[in-house]
From Swiss-Prot:
Domain (Helicase ATP-binding) ranges: 230-447
EC primary class: hydrolase
Biased composition range(s): Basic and acidic residues: 156-167, 814-832
GO terms under cellular component: nucleolus
Keyword set includes Acyltransferase: no
Biased composition (Basic residues): 29-42, 105-114, 141-155
Family, similarity comment: Belongs to the DEAD box helicase family. DDX24/MAK5 subfamily.
Acidic residues: compositionally biased ranges: 128-137
Binding positions for ATP per the UniProt entry: 243-250
Keyword entries, A-Z: ATP-binding, Helicase, Hydrolase, Nucleotide-binding, RNA-binding
Protein name listed in UniProt: DEAD-box ATP-dependent RNA helicase 13
Length: 832
């Protein structure tokens, strides 16, 4: 708003002397040319000053500003973003703003000193200079015109800046995703060509998701992804999917979720451009849209990482919620209102029961996912899953009822309120013929069956209120295990399992290897023995802290020849690049666990090897396992028994060392426990041992320590030498029997002995540990010399029956021949 224009100068200030010399006028004109528009300001300022000094009453209270920098009128001040530290909506640090403001003030003061005090003098200073007395009314009109044009320019500049800011905020996704990030990825060489992802375009995948797929390097969808995506993303159906491990089930449900959320965001953006109030309301709240449950913490983090990679350039947040980590930190993550939450049932229910607002407000939940559902339904596990399912809002498939039954639907846009989709994925699937009829009945009696136990995938799907038209995708009928998986076994005793395992790791230890145990005690024993033998192994089991488990997983991913010893909890869904070998140190208790164990290798159409160590006590379980997998023949892993004596020598020393160290550590732990508890209770420990017993104990400990050092030294000497077969002799080397490989190995061994630098590191692929044999992967050894053995119980029984019949037949023939000979002898005697 502008104030009234300043009045003309009073008559006493106008020059009334006609004898004014013309030199003054010329000086004024020169000043006008040099100082531009500042002359009218000084004239108005002089007029205001003279008026105030004359004591006249000024009606306009803002007239005193006529000579200031404001230009004689009031207007909205134009804010410079740089002056207030605002860049793209973000405010700089206040201290930095103050420092910048101080620098600007100093610069202005320096300018004042250079120009002189008369340029910035305020009315009432008493020493104003009048320079344009002869201009009169023409000068005032010129000043007003310049002020109007200046005001229009400022308003226009402000409008342009505001429009540019709105454009940046509205097109933030397109500019960021299609601009800088894409350009950076292209420069890095991580994106495939557009013609290489034609199969994804046929599925009508969102362009931003196609960009993510190109960046991840997925040229075409896997069969499970191709089958599930149209039904889930475009038809809005529930999906029950089953496929072999490593087939891409995570993106099979992850991409439809991201597709739907992106489409809803685009609709919301279009509506917000038409109605600004809707945009303000939508920007305030981001409700929970997708809840994904997994049985293990590692799998939850892996699923979260995969979804984050797919949604890297999207305005969609994905947060993992698992046990073993700080609840306070996870609550802070949930305060950000992420659209997708991936977690385990235990920690999710713990946060729900404490009243976390983001998790209990499920009115806008559009996706509910159960990954590895066959593990979820095991009896005695995941009681929290049933409680979480009971908290889900009841919807019968109509949008109107969903809106009516939502208590706080005012904060959720209508386009976000969708029929909830339920996804159930597993590596195994067993559904009855009338499963769809059960689902139809389950929708009516969902509340009545809420108290039933989740004993099967059918019961789980029924309680999760899946719709009768759910899409069932079962790709496990032909082959449950990966196609390129080579299965094998080794028959040995329980005591020899360690020896054969060490043989595999030392002779064929190439590539990443996972060793599975059924018990934590066996895992600890095995990892301790392998570490004594110089093999650096990683461990992962349920009694470890979550940070240690995550660290072990990261270290396993980093090294190409790493070895991990884990329990069955690690067998579910974990995806590692290029795991070459899986070893079953102990057979699992069920076929499903065996499938998940073996599925850690041969993923993404790559080859892999599985080796099972079978003891006499495991034979019945092993044959039952083969029968359930419809396997009649299985390859027996080739073992060169000439190396086993050298392996047993090392293993014997390692077991003795491990036994002594375990005993010492147990004694130290007991002593520290007694001392710690005695100190906490304020008691003094008294030893009842006599002096002789103490001396005897000291001597025994000293002898044990000396024995331990000797054993360690002997083992170190053995480990410094390569494994030698029993028939190998260094004294008598037949020239004809020395192969080029053996000759090369002997030359290398002699060089090492001369240099004195022989060392063994079990995790280096270039190490030399075996004489007479080149180090190859177990898969290659199995393909080269593996022999198929019948593992079918029925066939073995048939073979035994045939062998028994043949034996009886032979016995009868022998008996008949003997009787025939006796008769002939008797007849011959009678004749004589």
């Amino acid at each position: 708003m502008a104030a009234a224009p300043p009045p003309p100068p009073p008559p006493q200030l106008q020059s009334s002397d006609p004898s004014t010399p013309p030199q003054e006028t010329s000086q004024v004109r020169k000043g006008k040319k040099s100082r531009g528009a500042k002359k009218p300001r000084r004239a108005a300022a002089a007029a205001a000053a003279s008026t105030s000094s004359a004591g006249t009453m000024v009606e306009d209270p803002f007239l005193v500003l006529a000579g200031g920098k404001e230009g004689g009128f009031l207007e909205l001040e134009e804010i410079d973003e740089a002056d207030f530290g605002i860049f793209g909506g973000a405010v700089e640090d206040l201290g930095e703003i103050d420092r910048k403001a101080g620098k600007d003030q100093k610069k202005k003061k320096r300018k004042k000193r250079k120009r002189g005090d008369d340029d910035y003098a305020l009315p009432g200073d008493g020493d104003l200079v009048v320079e344009c007395e002869e201009e009169g009314e023409k000068g005032e009109k010129r000043v007003k015109k310049k002020r109007r044009s200046r005001k229009k320019r400022k308003v226009k500049e402000m409008e342009e800046k505001m429009e540019s800011k709105e454009d940046v905020s509205d097109d933030n996704v397109e500019d960021m995703q299609d601009g800088n990030d894409m350009e950076q990825d292209n420069n890095d060489g991580l994106i495939l060509g557009e013609d290489e992802v034609y199969a994804w375009r046929e599925l009508r995948l969102h362009p931003l998701l196609i960009t993510a797929v190109r960046r991840l390097g997925f040229k075409e969808p896997t069969p499970i992804q191709k089958a599930c995506f149209p039904a889930a993303a475009h038809q809005g159906k529930d999906v029950i999917g089953a496929a072999e491990t490593g087939s891409g089930k995570t993106l099979a449900f992850g991409l439809p979720i991201l597709q739907r959320l992106l489409e809803e965001q685009e609709k919301a953006m279009r509506l917000s451009r038409e109605d600004e109030s809707t945009q303000d309301e939508n920007s305030r709240e981001s409700p929970l849209r997708a809840l994904i449950l997994t049985p293990t913490r590692e799998l939850a983090k892996q699923v979260c990482d995969h979804l984050k990679e797919a949604a890297k350039f999207l305005r969609i947040q994905v947060v993992p919620i698992v046990g073993g980590l700080s609840m306070e930190k996870q609550e802070r993550l949930l305060k950000r209102k992420p659209e997708i939450v991936v977690g385990t049932p235990g920690r999710l229910w713990e946060l729900m029961s404490t009243g976390n607002q983001h998790l209990i407000k499920l009115h806008s939940l559009s996706f509910f996912v159960l990954d590895e559902a066959d593990r979820m339904i095991e009896r005695g596990h995941f009681h929290e899953l049933q409680s979480i399912i009971e908290m889900l809002p009841v919807t019968n498939g109509s949008d109107e009822q969903t809106v009516g039954t939502t208590p706080s639907c005012e904060t959720v846009p209508i386009l976000q309120i969708k029929k909830r989709q339920t996804f159930v994925f597993s590596a195994t699937l067993a559904l009855s013929a009338n499963f769809r009829k059960k689902l139809k009945r389950g929708l009516v009696t969902a509340k009545a069956s809420a108290s039933t136990d989740l004993s099967s995938i059918e019961a789980l799907s029924k309680q999760a209120r899946m719709k009768p038209n759910a899409e069932i995708v079962d790709l496990t009928k032909a082959s449950i295990l990966p196609e390129k998986l080579e299965e094998s076994f080794i028959e040995c005793s329980d005591d020899d399992k360690d020896a054969y395992l060490y043989y595999i790791l030392s002779v064929h230890g190439q590539g990443r290897t996972i060793i599975f145990c059924t018990s934590i005690a066996a895992l600890r024993h095995l990892s301790s023995i392998l570490r004594v033998l110089g093999i650096n192994v990683l461990t992962n089991h349920a009694q470890m802290q979550q940070r240690a488990r995550m660290k072990a997983v990261d270290r396993f991913r980093e090294s190409e020849n790493s070895i991990l010893v884990a329990t069955d909890g690690f067998a579910r869904g974990m995806d590692f690049d290029d795991v070459r070998t899986v070893i079953h140190y102990q057979l699992p208790h069920s076929t499903d666990v065996y499938i998940h164990r073996s599925g850690r290798t041969a993923r993404k159409s790559m080859a892999g090897c599985s080796i099972a160590l079978i003891s006499p006590a495991d034979k019945a379980k092993f044959y039952s396992l083969c029968k359930s997998l419809s396997k009649e023949n299985l390859q027996q892993f080739p073992v060169d028994h000439a190396y086993m004596p050298a392996v047993m020598n090392r293993l014997t020393l390692a077991r003795q060392i491990d036994k002594i160290t375990r005993k010492n550590s147990q004694e130290n732990a007991n002593k520290s426990w007694l001392q710690r508890n005695a100190e906490s209770m304020g008691l003094l420990l008294e030893t009842s041992d006599s002096e002789e017993e103490r001396v005897q104990g000291h001597k025994q400990r000293k002898a044990t320590s000396a024995n331990l050092q000797k054993l360690q030294q002997d083992l170190s000497e053995l480990l410094q030498r390569p494994l030698q077969p029993k028939t190998f002799s260094r004294r008598y080397l037949a020239g004809a029997g020395v192969s080029p490989l053996l000759q090369k190995q002997l030359e290398e061994l002699s060089k090492r002995n001369v240099k004195g630098s022989a060392s063994v590191n079990a995790n280096k692929g270039s190490r030399f540990v075996v004489i007479g044999q080149d180090q190859i992967e177990p898969l290659q050894a199995l393909q080269n010399s593996g022999q198929e053995v019948c593992v079918s119980i029925d066939k073995q029984r048939e073979k035994r029956r045939l062998a028994e019949n043949w034996r009886r037949k032979k016995q009868k023939e022998k008996k008949s021949t003997r009787e025939q000979k006796r008769k002939e002898k008797r007849i011959a005697k009678e004749r004589d």
